[in-house]
């Protein structure tokens, strides 16, 4: 007696279902998450206008706006194309690249916008810059924790290099502030790992549901074909 093997369809595979859910959540919230850095950059530029290097500030603001336009163009192309098994990895990598570049832009802000000069309150102005960056990272963690690599690609360049830079400056307050930023980065990493495990659990449950549905549909088809052969 011949056995019947029911292979899962590509759209029901575990890897595809996981990536598809991640992409859907990342891009569905991107309309708002892509806008926040622009608003934050404008507020920061207004506050730092009197103390920042003007040339650096102009270039940095230009990069923020250009990057936002590029991300919204990416979002528009995504909605025009959609997700399929053959392009899911591409859309995830594109989003990964966009958040990494955003993290670099904000990490640079904490190192070059405010001059380390005794004539200005460097710790105050740079502290506000890092406070805004930490706020953006913590807000993004809610969306980006579904994929640990996406969160790391954004948070690491945004927080770790400026934290190391503050420690490297050597004075008591800035070094302590840099250490607290690294501690904060550790805390959000632990929280993100827990959120990611919960997400993977729900994806596993959804995958099992889809596999059962797929096998049931295939069995119905096999049963229907078998009845047709009996009637012949």
Describe the function of each predicted region.
Residues 16-27, 85:
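Cytosolic juxtamembrane amphipathic/interface segments immediately preceding
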Residues 189-203:
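Short helix-terminus and kink motifs of transmembrane alpha helices
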Residues 83-99:
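Juxtamembrane helix-capping/reentrant segments at transmembrane boundaries
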Residues 13, 26-82, 163, 182, ...:
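Hydrophobic alpha-helical transmembrane segments of multi-pass membrane proteins
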Residues 1-14:
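Short, charged cytosolic
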Residues 96-190:
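Hydrophobic transmembrane alpha-helices
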Residues 197, 204-232:
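Amphipathic alpha-helical coiled-coil "transmission" helices that mediate dimerization
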């Amino acid at each position: 007696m011949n056995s019947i093997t029911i292979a899962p369809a590509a759209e029901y595979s575990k890897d595809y279902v996981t990536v598809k859910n991640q992409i859907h959540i990342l891009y569905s919230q991107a309309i708002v998450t892509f806008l926040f850095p622009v608003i934050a950059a404008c507020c920061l530029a207004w506050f730092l206008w009197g103390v920042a290097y003007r040339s650096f500030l102009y270039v940095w603001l230009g990069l923020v706006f250009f990057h936002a336009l590029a991300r919204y163009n990416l979002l528009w192309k995504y909605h025009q194309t959609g997700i399929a098994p053959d392009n899911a990895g591409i859309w995830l990598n594109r989003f990964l690249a966009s958040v990494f570049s955003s993290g670099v832009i904000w990490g640079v802000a904490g190192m070059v916008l405010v001059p380390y000069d005794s004539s200005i309150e460097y710790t105050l102005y740079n502290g506000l810059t890092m406070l805004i960056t930490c706020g953006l990272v913590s807000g993004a963690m809610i969306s980006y924790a579904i994929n640990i690599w996406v969160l790391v690609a954004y948070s690491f360049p945004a927080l770790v290099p400026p934290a190391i830079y503050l420690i490297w400056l050597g004075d008591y307050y800035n070094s302590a502030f840099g250490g607290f930023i690294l501690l904060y980065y550790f805390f959000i990493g632990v929280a993100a790992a827990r959120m990611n495990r919960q997400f993977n659990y729900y994806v596993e449950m959804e995958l099992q549901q889809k596999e059962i549905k797929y096998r049931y549909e295939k069995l119905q088809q096999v049963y229907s074909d078998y009845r047709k052969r009996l009637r012949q």
